[in-house]
């Protein structure tokens, strides 16, 4: 009688045989919505029929790992490189069959431990890049269960500090008032020493507060040139001020700077960025009663309460480094390998008219590691790839989510609404 292991191997082999053939994946695929591209860019659809793809991670051998939020887990994709956008899927298989995985993924510096997140836990798996296999999962961080829509737990291991895992957790409801205290454990980024997570899981609230007052910072990235950590904020829905609805154009989405994790004298480590009390202005004309209000100024929503006033918002919390159009929903930020630009996926709106977002954009950075645009700018965002008609969104257009650079400087991007994976070449 065959052993359990041999039967398992047979089942795995049969499953692999059912995957699409190489030739089929190298065929010309037609996108649901052909991206419009800025001059100098090229793009190609290389994989479709993904199940709500979210985050991307290249392993040490150039294999691409895709988190699929649609109850699938993590997919392992081997690529054939023919230069430029001529990239084909050589093979693919299910790496982790865990339907509870929601978004986050990261690899240890040596490439041998894979981290992934559910809504409640961060899991660690022994990982073999060559074989495309994982070992038994173990929970290393727990205690993140909450109600509401914000169930992603973004993960980042800074290259400047490879023993640290940053975990971003959003609010529960739209306006989560208890997060006015960092001890709530929500609407913040916490840091964990991986060297101390070899035993049982630790609660999320035991991590070091790296930044708080961050409503739902799904995208967290590192500038490779100076180690600066940046996040992109999905801000408040249905904003009003003293009973007046201002939500269509306010508040703006945010690009926030957290400094470098390795910096012993980083003054931004543990800083408060304002939520749930303060929100960045995008359209100044609808914000009344605030002298000299500018794009990026932080103001209250609702009515003043105690010490929480517009003046408080403009003097106490850290203001965003840049502000973007309201409700465009930035979900990832990845820096070009030269550190001179950051690419941001804007998933797109549900809470404004006309619809906006649904695009990939970039922000230019200078040699000092900061955006070249002023914090009051409305033109810092440079569109890279977009839909030709946002009126058909969100139902019939691409909605970018996860981004990843390969070793040749190409940018890979997934669209969750259409289940697609694109590769882009960028200008020198």
Protein language model features and the residues they cover:
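Asp-box/WD-like beta-propeller blade repeats and closely related beta-sheet repeat scaffolds
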Residues: 92, 101-102, 120-159, 171-173
């Amino acid at each position: 009688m065959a052993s359990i292991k041999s039967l398992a191997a047979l089942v795995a082999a049969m499953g692999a045989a059912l995957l699409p053939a190489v030739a089929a994946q190298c065929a010309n695929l037609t996108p649901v919505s052909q991206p419009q591209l800025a001059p100098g860019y090229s793009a190609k659809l290389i994989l479709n029929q993904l199940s709500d793809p979210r985050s991307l991670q290249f392993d040490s051998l150039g294999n691409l790992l895709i988190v699929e939020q649609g109850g699938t887990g993590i997919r392992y994709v081997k690529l054939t490189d023919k230069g430029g956008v001529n990239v084909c899927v050589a093979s693919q298989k299910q790496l982790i069959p865990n339907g509870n995985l929601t978004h986050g993924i990261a690899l240890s510096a040596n490439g041998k431990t894979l981290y992934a997140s559910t809504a409640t836990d961060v899991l660690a798996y022994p990982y073999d890049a060559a074989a495309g296999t994982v070992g038994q999962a173990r929970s290393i961080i727990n205690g993140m269960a909450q109600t509401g829509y914000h169930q992603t737990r973004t993960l980042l291991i800074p290259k400047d500090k490879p023993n640290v895992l940053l975990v971003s957790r959003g609010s529960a409801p739209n306006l989560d008032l208890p997060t006015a205290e960092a001890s709530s454990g929500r609407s913040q980024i916490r840091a964990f020493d991986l060297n101390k997570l070899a035993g049982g899981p630790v609660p999320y609230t035991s991590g070091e507060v790296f930044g708080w007052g961050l409503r739902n910072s799904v995208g967290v990235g590192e500038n490779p040139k100076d180690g600066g950590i940046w996040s992109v904020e999905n801000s408040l829905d249905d904003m009003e001020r003293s009973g007046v609805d201002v939500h269509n154009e306010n508040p703006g989405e945010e690009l926030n700077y957290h400094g470098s994790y390795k910096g012993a004298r980083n003054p931004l480590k543990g800083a408060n960025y304002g939520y749930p009390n303060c929100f960045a202005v995008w359209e100044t004309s609808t914000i009344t009663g605030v002298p000299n209000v500018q794009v990026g100024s932080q103001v209250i929503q609702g009515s003043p309460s105690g010490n929480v006033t517009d003046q408080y918002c403009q003097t106490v919390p850290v203001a965003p480094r840049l502000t973007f159009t309201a409700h465009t929903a930035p979900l990832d930020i990845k820096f070009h390998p030269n550190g001179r630009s950051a690419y941001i996926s804007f998933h797109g709106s549900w809470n404004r008219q006309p619809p906006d977002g649904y695009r990939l954009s970039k922000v230019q950075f200078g040699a000092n590691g900061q955006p070249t645009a002023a914090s009051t700018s409305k033109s810092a965002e440079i569109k890279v790839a977009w839909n030709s008609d946002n009126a058909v969104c969100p139902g019939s257009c691409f909605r970018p989510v996860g981004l990843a650079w390969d070793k040749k400087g190409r940018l890979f991007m997934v669209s969750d609404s259409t289940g697609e994976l694109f590769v882009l070449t960028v200008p020198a």
